Design a protein with these regions (language model features):
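Basic/polar, cationic surfaces and motifs that engage anionic cell-wall
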Residues: 1-21, 94-169
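Structural preference for beta-strand elements that scaffold enzyme active sites
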Residues: 26, 85-87, 133-135
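Cell-envelope and extracellular/periplasmic
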Residues: 33, 84-98, 139
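Short, charged/polar low-complexity linear motifs in solvent-exposed/disordered segments
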Residues: 81-84, 160-161
Length: 169
């Protein structure tokens, strides 16, 4: 199962995932670490890496479904988080130290977060740690992911998603 706002899909089937045993109640944000085409990144994860994600967002704002939402992606290295989270990879439009993302990617990230929260009936709560319903990869592993640029957007993402959900009940 994927969001209706997906532009493309890369069928992972049962690869690089496990069945969920928890309900979806959070979103975890990642960065690609490159300005990768989201279809290419999803296929690379599916075919060559021991990682996966539910969604991939390109710098052009395109959204690609990877691991179906009814399955747990291998994203953070923390099974408990991945069991309850939808994991989203976002392409970077610049490299470090900022690892910025494009305006189009941010707009698509907001739209996807809104859609997920609506369908699973939860609000985003940015606490800055693993206990919120909006989390980041670096909360579970020694990594810079999702990078300073997206980290600086987390509170605003949470506030804007919740504002939209409240206004358009």
């Amino acid at each position: 199962m994927f969001s209706d706002i997906c532009d493309y899909y890369v069928d992972f089937g049962y690869k690089k995932s496990h069945q969920r045993y928890k309900s979806i109640s959070k979103i975890t944000i990642h960065h690609m670490g490159a300005n990768s085409n989201p279809i290419y990144c999803a296929k690379w994860h599916r075919d060559d890496k021991d990682v996966s994600s539910n969604y991939y967002i390109g710098s052009d704002g395109s959204i690609v479904g990877g691991v179906s939402e009814d399955r747990r992606a291998w994203s953070t290295g923390d099974e408990d988080n991945d069991q309850s989270a939808i994991n989203i990879e976002v392409a970077n439009c610049s490299r470090g130290p900022e690892w910025s993302v494009s305006y189009e990617a941010l707009v698509s990230l907001l739209a996807l977060c809104i859609d997920i929260c609506k369908r699973y009936n939860f609000r985003l709560n940015w606490t800055g740690d693993e206990y919120g319903s909006l989390t980041t990869h670096n909360m579970f592993a020694q990594t810079i992911c999702p990078g300073p640029y997206l980290m600086n957007w987390m509170k605003d993402i949470s506030l804007n998603v919740n504002k939209y959900l409240e206004e358009y009940k």
